[in-house]
UniProtKB/Swiss-Prot annotation:
Function: With S4 and S12 plays an important role in translational accuracy.
Organism for this UniProt entry: Acinetobacter baylyi (strain ATCC 33305 / BD413 / ADP1)
Record-given protein name: Small ribosomal subunit protein uS5
Keywords: Ribonucleoprotein, Ribosomal protein, RNA-binding, rRNA-binding
InterPro entries: Ribosomal_Su5_D2-typ_SF, Ribosomal_uS5, Ribosomal_uS5_bac-type, Ribosomal_uS5_C, Ribosomal_uS5_N, Ribosomal_uS5_N_CS, Ribsml_uS5_D2-typ_fold_subgr
This protein's record includes keyword Cell cycle: no
Family as reported in the entry's similarity comment: Belongs to the universal ribosomal protein uS5 family.
An MF annotation (GO) of this entry: rRNA binding
Biological process, per Gene Ontology: translation
Cellular component, GO annotation: small ribosomal subunit
Subunit structure: Part of the 30S ribosomal subunit. Contacts proteins S4 and S8.
Gene that encodes it: rpsE
Domain remark text: The N-terminal domain interacts with the head of the 30S subunit; the C-terminal domain interacts with the body and contacts protein S4. The interaction surface between S4 and S5 is involved in control of translational fidelity.
């Protein structure tokens, strides 16, 4: 499902390619949409969508959009900081940190995002719609909203020990 390439230090993953149709008076005009994920494997990850009459053109547009749309994720080593819930449309995702050696336990589109971000140990589940675009969006929302204890402590004016109890 996910095609992987290495380019300029970034991991590029092809998550989905769909054929779409525009209906006109003379029939249907087919084009392709591509959904890609790009990451450096060290906390920076982005996703993009591209649309074109040919598959390779759609993929290159999607990769370019993904490189422009990168975010930085606060990771705790090779896992997440804390459990995260997020949703986009009818897709809901739940991700929780896992101990070393667990691996990436996640389905399809979520797996591509987490691996590109550099998360090596995580337990994740997708509920509701499994539409790849919505799952990727929900996963991004969850990763973007995740905060480290250091940032929470700084925001509250407390020490990390007081935050973690």
């Amino acid at each position: 499902m996910a095609k992987v390439e290495q380019n300029e230090g970034l991991v590029e993953k092809l998550v989905a390619v769909d054929r779409v149709a525009k209906v006109v008076k003379g029939g249907r005009i087919f084009s392709f949409t591509a959904l890609t994920v790009v990451g450096d494997g060290n906390g920076r990850v982005g996703f993009g969508r591209g649309k074109a009459r040919e598959v390779p053109a759609a993929i290159s547009k999607a990769l370019e959009a993904a490189r422009r749309n990168m975010i930085t994720v606060d990771l705790a080593g090779t896992t997440l900081q804390h459990p995260v819930n997020a949703r986009h449309g009818a897709s809901r995702v739940y991700m929780q940190p896992a101990s070393e050696g667990t691996g990436v336990i996640a389905g399809g589109a979520m797996r591509a995002v987490l691996e590109a971000a550099g998360v090596h140990n995580v337990l994740a589940k997708c509920y509701g719609s499994t539409n790849a675009a919505n799952v990727v969006n929900a996963t991004f929302k969850g990763l973007r909203d995740m905060t480290s204890p250091e940032k929470v402590a700084a925001k509250r004016g407390l020490s990390v020990e007081q935050i973690q109890g």
